Amino acid sequence: MGYTNQPKFLNLCIEIETELNPQSLLKCCLTTEQQLHRKREIRWGPRTLDIDILLFGDQIIEQDNLSVPHPRMKERSFVLIPLNDIATKQIEPISNKSIGQLVVPDNSVKKYKE
């Protein structure tokens, strides 16, 4: 899946409360990426960080620059495993299944330990 010739990286999920609408939140995410010197040179290639909006409550959003739920979220254990840690009962609105129901074990995904 994607570009594999790159260093190991961390994936994490956070849950936030915001009064921003989805487009404003996306703009905030992209601005943060730019401020931290994100370069988009290779699709799915190495990066300093990548901020995605996985879910926005129970909304389904299809716009030119934003799809929520994230369209490849359900295929990616490296997304679902950390998301399950914080939102196991959260419903993914397209499948109408909880994150806990969608996540499958994947030995290639390792939890970070200090």
Predicted regions and their residues:
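Flexible, gly/pro- and Lys/Arg-enriched active-site loops
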Residues: 1-10, 18-114
